[in-house]
Amino acid sequence: MNASSEDVKDMLVAVSALGLTFATNLFIGKEEKTPRNCVTIFDTAGYAPDLGLTNQGYERPSIQIRVRNTKYVTGWNLIESIKTSLHGRAQETWNDTLYTVIYCSSGPAHLDWDDNGNARFIINFNLQRRAA
């Protein structure tokens, strides 16, 4: 299985209302300097793989999504829309990986203002998945 961030990236791009395009305003692992309005997905420490389901390779990773925007309210609205798009998704296959559930574990929350005066928000998700 690939990194969870790769699959979540595809999920977010598929929601056209979010207006996200990979490598344009949606990134993985590194928040680019431009554009100022963007979304970045980070793979973060999750839970240990389920030992009771070792034959299925059942994993429980987590991700953090960070939204940066020049306007506080616009950034907040986008991270709320991302939460709505991902929270509660279940029994979906993406890139040969079955996601049995995705749920918001914390956030959204205002993280800080970056050095350029952009508002940054974060949200965390736990995922449960196995090879399809």
Language-model features: locations:
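Small/polar-rich, solvent-exposed N-terminal microdomains that initiate assembly or binding
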Residues: 1-55, 77, 89-95
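Short beta-strand or tight-loop elements
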Residues: 37, 61, 107-109
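Residue-level signal for secondary-structure boundary sites
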Residues: 49, 73-75, 131
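Oligomerization/assembly interface segments of phage tail-like spikes and tubes
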Residues: 57-71, 82, 119-129
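Mid-chain, well-packed structural core segment of small domains
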Residues: 67-91
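Acidic-leaning, charged glycine-interspersed low-complexity segments
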Residues: 87-132
